[in-house]
Amino acid sequence: MINKAAIVLLLWLMCSTVWAQQLPRSRFDSIQQVDEVIISSRYNHKEVIPSQTLNGEQLEKLNAHSVADALRYFSGIQLKDYGGVGGIKTVNIRSMGTNHLGISYDGVELGNAQNGQIDLGQFSLDNVEEITLFNGQKSAILQPASDFGHAGAIYIRTRAPRFSDGKGYNLKFKARYGSSDMFRFSTLWEQRLSSKVSSSVSAEVLTASGKYKFRYRRKKQDGTVAYDTTAIRENGDIWAVRAEGNLHGMISDGFWKFKLYTYNSERGIPGAIVNNVWRRGERQWDHNYFTQARFQKSFGERFTTQAVAKYAYYNTRYVNRDTTLLNVDNTYKQQELYFSTSNVYNLLPIWSASLSYDFKWNRLDSDMRQFVTPQRYAHYVALASALNLERFKIQASVLATMVKDRLNDGTSSKSMTEYTPAVFANVYPFASKELSIRAYAKKSFRMPTFNDLYYTEIGNALLKPESALQYNVGLSYDRQWPSGLFRFFHLQTDVYYNSVHDKIVAYPKGQQFRWTMLNLGRVHIKGIDVETELTVVPVSGLLVTGRLQYTYQDARDVTDPEDTFYRDQIPYIPWHSGTAILNIQYKKWDFNYSFIYAGERYNQQENIKYNYMQPWYTSDLSLSYRFKIKETAFRITGEVNNVFSQDYDVILNYPMPKRNYGLTLDVKI
C-alpha cells in the first residue's frame, strides 16, 4: 500500500529545500521571452520515411498531460479512451491493432506480454522532450532487432540535461488543479556531476476523485428512448506516484544512459454503464518498475555499435466486488528481461549495413486457480542495409523472429519462426529537397499475448498468430522563409493499403480489465493520411501556427462471405477523423485552440443500426502568460476542455467528461 502522507511530505520537503537556496540565472528554453521569432524545421531530410513529431514546446501549448493525450494529434492513430483522469488509454495504428505498434521509452521498447496493451495514460509529459511517430518503422538501420518488426513505432524521448555556462543544475516545478478534484504535482531536478556526466530526477503525484457529470441516453432497436438521464460518474478515483532517475554520460564518439523508473497507482474502474447500472465495484493496483541501460559508440568513421539491457517487473492486482457478478480478487506478476546489440558498418560513404540481435524473456504468474504460468523466450535477428545518394535513398531489412512458450508443467506451446522483410525508398525530384516522394512495402507479425492464449476464463489457445502486409505511397513538401509573412509550410500525405491475416481483436466485456479474444480472419484496410502546417508572422512579435490532420480509413472484415458482417467496417474504426490546432503567440501570451473529430463508426462486427455510434467532436481552449520574478520564470495556464460540453463515448458505455477546467502553474529556476 502506498504511504500517501509520506510521499506528499517528501515532495514538500524537496520543494522547501530548493526554494531556500539562492539560485543563479535560469536558461530553460521553453519559458524565456524571445525577442526574435526563429522557425526551425522538424522534418529531417535524412529520413527515408518522414515522421510526425511533437516537441516539448508544442506539447506545452497543447496542454496535453499524458503521452496518450498528445498522440490524439497524429494522423493514422486511433485512441481507445475509457474516460476520466484514471481511465485506461491505448492506441491503435492504421486499424491494425495496438499490438502492431511498438512504443519505445528513451530508445528501449516498453513491453506487456500479458495483454500487449501499454496504458499510455501512465506516462506523464512533464519530463518528455519529444514524441515521434513512424509508420512502418524508424528510418534508421542502427536500432534493436525487434524494432524492425513493428507496423509502426512511437519513440518517447525524455529531457536530456542542458546547462548554461557556469550553471550546475536546473529545477522545474509544475502544479495543476482541475475538474474531478484533480491535482497533479511534478518536479524535475537536473544536476551536473562532471564535464561528462549529469543526472536528472523526476517525480510526480496525481490524485483525483474522477467524478464528472455525463448524459446517458440509449434507444431501443425500434428507435424509442430506453434511457435518458444525467448522472455522475462514480468509482473513477485515482492515486498515482511516478518517479524516474537518470544518469547521462558522454564518451569519445558516443554516450551512455542509465534509467530507474517506478509507477505505483490505485484506481477505481467505473466500468461500462449497462442496464442503467452506474457504479461497479472494480479496483486496480499497479506497481511497475523497470531499469534500463543504453550504450552507443562509434569506432572511426565506419563502425558504430549499440547495446541495450532492461529488466522490468509489473505487479497488478484486480478486484471486482460487484454483487451481481462472481467475486474476483486476482494478482498478476509479470517479469521481462531484455538484451539487444546492434551494429552498423559503413561499406562506402553512401552505403551501410547493420546486424542486430535481441533476446527477450517474459514470465507471467497469477494466483488464479490452474494458471499455467507461461514463459516466453524470443530471439530476433535483423539484417539491414541503406543506400543514401544525394536525391535517392533506399533501405531494406529482413527480421527473423523465433518464439517458444513454456508452461509450468514443463510442456512447450506455440513455437514458431517467422521472417518479415521490408523495403523503403525516398526520391527528391528537385535539388532543393523541398519535395520528396516515398514508398514502402513491409510484412509485420505478432504473436498472441499471454492473455490471448492462456487467460483462465477467456483465453483462446486456438488463436493463430497475426500478420500484416503494408503498402504505402506518399509525398512531403516543406518550405521555409527567413523573413516576411510566411515562415514555414509543410504538407504530407500518404495513401496506404494494409492486409491483416488472422486478426486478433480485443473487445471490452463489461469489465475494463478483461477482454474477449477472437480471430477475425482477414481484414483489408485502405486509408489516406493528410497533414499540413503553416506558420505566419503578421506583425513583429506575433507568431501564428495552424496545423490540420485528416485520416480516412476503410477497414473491412473479408473473412467469410457467409458471415452477416462480411465486408462490414470493423469495430471502433471511423471512416473519417481529424484534428485542427491553432496557436497564437504574442509577446508573453500564448493562446491555443484544438479540435478533435471522430466520424461515424460501429461498436460491433455487424454494421447495423443498433451498433451505430454517432460522430463526436471536442474543442479545447487554453491561455497562458509567461513572466519572471528576478531570475525565476513562471508560466500560468488556464484551460477549458470540451468547450461545448458535448456528450460522447469513445468506447460504448464509457461516457467521457463534459465541459471541464484546469489551472496550471509552471516554475523554472
Residue ranges of model-derived segments:
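Periplasmic-side early beta-strands and strand-to-turn transitions of outer-membrane beta-barrels
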Residues: 139, 155, 188-283
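Short, acidic, small-residue-rich periplasmic hinge/interaction motif at the N-terminus
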Residues: 22-60, 68, 135
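Flexible loop and strand-edge segments within Gram-negative outer membrane beta-barrel domains
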Residues: 24, 230, 234-243, 253-305, ...
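C-terminal beta-signal and adjacent terminal beta-strands/loops
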Residues: 501-502, 544, 597-604, 620-669
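Gram-negative outer-membrane beta-barrel transporters
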Residues: 353, 391, 490-499, 518-602, ...
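A beta-strand signature from Gram-negative outer-membrane beta-barrel systems
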Residues: 125-172
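Extracytoplasmic beta-strand/coil segments of soluble accessory domains associated
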Residues: 68, 72-109
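Membrane-embedded beta-barrel scaffold of Gram-negative outer-membrane proteins
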Residues: 302, 306-318, 437-440, 466-526, ...
